[in-house]
Amino acid sequence: MGEKLTLTMEAKTLYIILSVAVEGEECRECKPYLDRYGELCDEFGKDSGEVCINRRFYFNALGLYWMTVGELFKAEQWFKTALEEDKCESGTENDVSDVVIKLNLCTVAIKQNDPERLCALLSELEEMKEEDDSEFTDRCRYMMQFGICVLYDSGYLELDEETAERFKDDIEVLKEDIIKNEASDKRCAAEAAVSVCMTAMLLIASDFATEAEREEYMRLMDHVTENYAPTLGPSRAAAINAMTAAIMCLRHDYRAASGYITAAEEFADSTEVMPVVLADLYTNKAVILFALNEEQRAAESAKKTLECIEKQRCEYVKYCNDKRLIGIMTFAQRAFLTVYGVLREVIKDDWELYEFVIRNKALASLTGKERNRVIQSGRMDTSLAKKIRAAQDRLAEIEARGVFVDSSADYEAEREKLREMEAEFAEEFPEDTVFTDITAEAVKRKIPCNSVVVEYSLYFEAEKADSPNEETKAAFDVFVIQKTETDCSIRRVVIPNASDIVERTEKFNMILQKEAQHEADSDDLDEKERLRASLYHDLLEPVEGFMAGFETVWLAPDTVAVNLPFDVLGRSKRDIPGDRHNFVIIECSRDFLFGSDGAANGSGSLIIGNPKYLLNEKTIPPKAKQDSDKDKKHESGGNERMVSYADLRNQDICPLPFSEIEANMVSLYCGESCFVGAEASKNHLLNCGTKRNIHIATHGFFDLEEETNSLYSSCLLFAGAGNWLKNGNATEKYGNGIVTADEISRMDCRNVELVVLSACFGGMNDAVLAKGFCGMVGGFAAAGVKYVISCLWTADDFASAVLMAEFYRQYKDRKLSPPAALRAAKKYLRRVTIQELEEKNWFDIALKNGELSSEARDAVLELSDMPPKFAPFNNEIYWAGFTCFRCN
């Protein structure tokens, strides 16, 4: 009895200590106390009868500890364990409520930059509050307010006037709460003050506050930062001061900002601060010091930011979910774009600046490649990797269902299972992993001789306090590296007005897509020519002189320019650089470090064409029969390899008879049989890692409206896709008939030299800040493929078949490299005449195809009657979209 009493007293003492310690900076030091308290909880069991021996409290405290030290996966899992633990039967107030635990999960989501998860948790909390608000203390209310502001600040929700007015009212209520709690509960007052600070910051940066209101909110933030931030501990105080400094920078008040950033640094120096917080602090400090003409100190702070980014990358490599990885690396990417703007003004060595770029461009892609390299090396538990992949495939199917069919009730349950395995993956990830040494010298050695690299890098321009800009300006630094057998030189070119270039790039791409679908009018075509010339003038003309004499040009665009057909940019469509150079698109020139110098080790070819999308039915009425007027505009009868979002929803997927002809042609050159019709299942692709060449001719999809996540909505369609879209039932042989970029990214395709996607939009990429290739190309890049050839817009079925036949003649018979073979094939397609098509029996082959619709048959006959010297595919819409990407 005496021993039990002693243990009980020990448990009560630890409970009191931990109740205070886990809420503050002392949490870092309390792990031994937590471990002992956990042992006592196990000793007494669930039904101890003692109020202070509380397993739910213990699990929540463990979550707080791991969150404080930056182990977010572990924190998340312990909070979830706490939620699953039953409350004490006594219902004592010493229990940690569901509300508090869910709010802790909200904090994890904020730190992971996962607004989708945060929004779901806040929605759950709102529902709980409507049912019973008894567990919602003032502090809970303040934390919810903070989370809601984060959703608007991140852009996940769009701030409107009505919401802004509500936020203004919230500030008044919060101010009253601060006064109410100031004497009795200083910490509660401080929590209210933090919510005030975040809400005020959001309004100051918006268009919905008057100048007088902004001034008032600035004074309020100043008061909060000075009087309440210290109460919350050094780490949070540092973050709040850095946040206030950022707002002062936005207002161009760099003197005031300097005071806040100094205070933030003092708080940070007194404790351990997560790298993401430090990166934000040093980024703001670099901007402030540069504005105040302390350039060398600014550069030192900028380099500290880069050190923090490196630490984040080494930590976040443990994320096996690319969607979450992109989200969490976005913070780091923004920090780099900002501090690089400072570094380039201070450092004049182009090789040094170039090294900053190749180490920090497209950070999520780089981190994902390093992670995949570890997985593929076999250093991790293979059974765990298989379990995770199976869970990810299941989640990908559910995500695809949400995009193309309907939402699924299984989604949250499956996602939670995956999150648990992600935590296990992070725990198992080798701590002694050595990452690729990315240096300018290493990349110089790997760049192929007798070629040019053109590396575009977006950055935010740094400003001076005495000449502030009305808004943040963006520009491109372009590094041009010429490599011969004996020399490797670098030049840097500055291209200003990046925001305007991005806008014009999007417009140019949109017109090309409209023209490919025969929907562009004369005004569109006139605008296209203006944009062609202006984009050439801005993006290529400044560097074209350095490309003279070099056939191969490795282009590494940034942002939406990755979707730009550079080879047709020129003063006019009759003077294009694609006639002078062989352009190959790369994500970043550091990727030469990840690929092999020689040919890939795979053997044989996988060839798929014209899948039977709807099984057990002879034919599917083509869309042309429903919209014949529109179809008459299509030279080859409307068999474009694209389905729109609505088409997929309506299960109206036309067959692609020319893609079967194409597959048979490719088979002849490769000496391999092809899979067509019902045999063209997705499983062939998902199990093709030992092949050297992969050719897929099918429908492709990409969400041009950017309403969905391209990891799941960027996809290829295979046999059975129509059945799944109609009834939602996947089968063992055919699955759901859809392969997403996400599924492909988890394959091991290091043996594959070339993937050819003869499908619409297969080459399109989402403009995601921390990613370069984000779509089907990004999926194959992550899987380890060396080259991908695909189309940026709607691909004409007949023209694609002719192009691909010539491509494989050049690639297989003439042994040209994929980029050189594609360039030769595009040149051939532009110039091939009706007579030459007849001589190669293209019209006879097409007309003998039994799946050809009557409209397509009429179009082929009409084409065959054209004058013999007529070049039917001279227009760039037939060939310019096909792009060669080198991924590794």
Model region roles, listed by residue range:
Residues 432-888:
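Catalytic cores of enzymes
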Residues 8, 49, 53, 93-96, ...:
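Residue signature of alpha-solenoid helical repeat architecture, marking inter-repeat boundaries
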Residues 12, 16, 54, 61, ...:
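"A position-specific structural signal for the A-helix of alpha-solenoid helical repeats
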Residues 21, 66, 109, 203-205, ...:
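Residue at a conserved register position within TPR or TPR-like alpha-solenoid repeats
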Residues 219, 226-227, 231-235, 239-242, ...:
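Alpha-helical solenoid repeat scaffolds used for protein-protein interaction
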Residues 38-46, 83-90, 123-130, 172-182, ...:
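Amphipathic alpha-helical segments of tetratricopeptide repeats
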